Amino acid sequence: MSDVLINPARVRRVKPLSAEEVVSAVERALLTEVRLTPKPGLVDIRNAGAHWDMDLASFEASTAVVAPWMEKFFIMGHDTAAVAPEQVLMMLRPVGMACENDMLEATGGVNTHRGAIFAFGLLSAAAGRLVSKGEPIEQHRLCDQVARFCRGMVMQELSSAGGERLSKGEAHFLRYGLSGARGEAESGFLTVRTQAMPVFTRMMEETGDSNLALLQTLLHLMAWNDDTNLVSRGGLAGLNFVQQEAQRLLWQGGVLADGGLEALRQFDDELIARHLSPGGSADLLAVTWFLSAFPAGALFPL
């Protein structure tokens, strides 16, 4: 059995999705992700992962502050439904910055959820826009709407970097061609849709255990996601190590193998020793859980 029992509830829609429901869904996703145990290199119930400045309590405190902001993202998406999607992104930025400031105040200046604010702010706004247009709230529609919000963002924000000081995102793109969270959003969470969600869905069908399903999904994300958090901490060598080790564990069966959970704990210890934390994959895992509450819908909706 896995370390924590979590019971998912797929949303059965009989009325339009409300902002309050989005807030609740994001809160569940963030808490589910951080409490899932064992997660290699990441904060969980077992330990603080490869972090000295944050722990489970700081993530829970951050979640309590961040989740309510999703109502504002939802309303912004709803009220700008007539605005071109590429223009909405600029309108969302001040909301995101204010949310981030509240997070930093709650955590004493520690960045617990910056990536999650970016991802879930976009998804919440996408949900609001779909509700305003009377469209179904489905996985593919939500992700496609995020892609429309973010169209052209990577080239505009990363490829034209100037000046002497580059942000981490700019440096990763210019040096390695890695687009990070921006690229994932602009693609409409392609890694989630093509890697994570199929694994999670299959594991739920086979085991009925959401914890095992999420842990196996996390391994797949760590194996294939070009996580720029890992590059920031360990360079390309750190990213390659994590990907290769995750792939090795998957070849052995992952969490379904004999001793699979113990292998994850050992992987956790190794990443802590190497100071490697796959925070980007953790964010995508939370997105996977959030999206799993909604029907997939058509891949190319009309």
Swiss-Prot record:
**One MF term in the entry's GO annotations:** triphosphoribosyl-dephospho-CoA synthase activity
Reaction catalysis annotation: 3'-dephospho-CoA + ATP = 2'-(5''-triphospho-alpha-D-ribosyl)-3'-dephospho-CoA + adenine
Q: Name one Pfam family in it.
A: CitG
Matching Gene3D superfamilies, A to Z? Triphosphoribosyl-dephospho-CoA protein
Source species, domain of life:
Bacteria
Fetch the InterPro entries from UniProt: CitG, TriPribosyl-deP-CoA_syn_CitG
Instruction: Supply the alphabetized keyword list.
Output: ATP-binding, Nucleotide-binding, Transferase
Q: Has the keyword Iron-sulfur been applied to this entry?
A: no
The GO biological-process annotations, alphabetized, read as: prosthetic group biosynthetic process
What family is this?
A: Belongs to the CitG/MdcB family.
Q: What does this protein do?
A: Catalyzes the formation of 2-(5''-triphosphoribosyl)-3'-dephosphocoenzyme-A, the precursor of the prosthetic group of the holo-acyl carrier protein (gamma chain) of citrate lyase, from ATP and dephospho-CoA.
Q: What name does UniProt use for this protein?
A: 2-(5''-triphosphoribosyl)-3'-dephosphocoenzyme-A synthase
Task: Give the organism the record lists.
Answer: Klebsiella pneumoniae
